[in-house]
Amino acid sequence: MRRVTVLGATGSIGRSTLDVMARHPDRYELYAATAHSNLNELFSICIKHRPRYAILATDAGLAGFKKRLRDAGVSTEVRVGVEAMCEASSASDVDVVVAAIVGAAGLVPTLAAVNSGKRILLANKEALVMTGRLFMDAVRRHGAELLPIDSEHNAIYQCLPEAGQHLSDMTSLAAYGVTRVLLTASGGPFRHFSQQQLQQVTPEQACRHPNWSMGRKISVDSASLMNKGLELIEACWLFDLTPGSVQVHLHPESIIHSMVEYVDGSILAQMGNPDMRTPIAYGLAWPERIDAGVQPLDLFSIGKLHFEMPDKERFPCLRLAEEAFSLGGTAPAVVNAANEVAVEAFLQGDIRFVDIPVVIEKSLLKGSIVDADSVETVIEADRVARQYASEAINELAGGVVVP
């Protein structure tokens, strides 16, 4: 029996994780579940899965939540704050930590799991984007077992030889004959929109992803291609690659989740229906395979698969992410922070969709990029970038009528 802490249990990744775990009650037990603000969903999780701990980001609604659990006869202990999340990630009773908190908020509890040498199912790409080498050095130093569960990175992982799957190893993938990684992207709902059409899109349109069921923030990131930019940075750190050896392909069907090219001309691809339970089940059970509850892929009904090159002129977020990785240091943390602030402003109706990359670029140009030599340095860069992004949004919002 493996005990699992799920950071971000009420989000789409967290719910998918719990669905897979519930299919295998003889293998997995929920140790702790964390939530930001969705207390109703966390209450349902406590009723169904009976975790030892339920952890809230803040004490908002704490008393009422505790009372609901008591009235329901649930003995789950309720705790609050980042420190409690870190303890749930590093507890000696915990075998697996699912890092599914969206954004920079997931960094500290994810690093707590790394520093405790846990098996970490990494969905929180921002933690790795922000800290890069610091994160991977900690994985190696503490003997953590890192398994990516972003569908694309999990696909790359599955296409590697067994010897190349040990991400704590310093060996370059070139030693295993890998020449290129082909990172796929759906292209989002605006793939064929003109620049004029992009100026008119609404948050509701941006959140309607054509293939995946995701949260609002990541749906907007997918629509802007920033999600793919962050994933490119994540792939470079996870697999010790350069941006030149990672090629982004738009693949609107979202059936091939990524590919790995080898020196002999072979390309291995991981395929499947777009359902996050597949990579989650892979991470939970690795090196075994378990039922994820996902429908088998019917290639006859699909018929054709399509590929396109991304347009970095219409979708400059991908270019900005690439530039941030090339700049190095705290630049990726700056881009990530500015994007989080800009996306929230777009969702609130304060700026247009096309203003998101403008805010990011202004923040990147204004910020002082320094060596990411400590977590504290990265967190400070994140804080300052958020301030710059807010200033840029205030400037833009002054003369913008948002549809």
Curated annotation (Swiss-Prot):
UniProt EC number: 1.1.1.267
Entry keyword Mitochondrion: no
Residues at which Mn(2+) binds: D150, E152, E231
Reactions mediated catalytically: 2-C-methyl-D-erythritol 4-phosphate + NADP(+) = 1-deoxy-D-xylulose 5-phosphate + NADPH + H(+)
One of the GO biological process terms: isopentenyl diphosphate biosynthetic process, methylerythritol 4-phosphate pathway involved in terpenoid biosynthetic process
Cofactor section: Mg(2+); Mn(2+)
Residues binding NADPH, per UniProt: T10, G11, S12, I13, N38, N124, E126, G215
Enzyme class: oxidoreductase
HAMAP family per record: DXP_reductoisom
Family classification: Belongs to the DXR family.
Function, as annotated: Catalyzes the NADPH-dependent rearrangement and reduction of 1-deoxy-D-xylulose-5-phosphate (DXP) to 2-C-methyl-D-erythritol 4-phosphate (MEP).
PANTHER family membership: 1-DEOXY-D-XYLULOSE 5-PHOSPHATE REDUCTOISOMERASE (PTHR30525), 1-DEOXY-D-XYLULOSE 5-PHOSPHATE REDUCTOISOMERASE, CHLOROPLASTIC (PTHR30525:SF0)
Protein name per UniProt: 1-deoxy-D-xylulose 5-phosphate reductoisomerase
Organism: Hahella chejuensis (strain KCTC 2396)
Gene name linked to the record: dxr
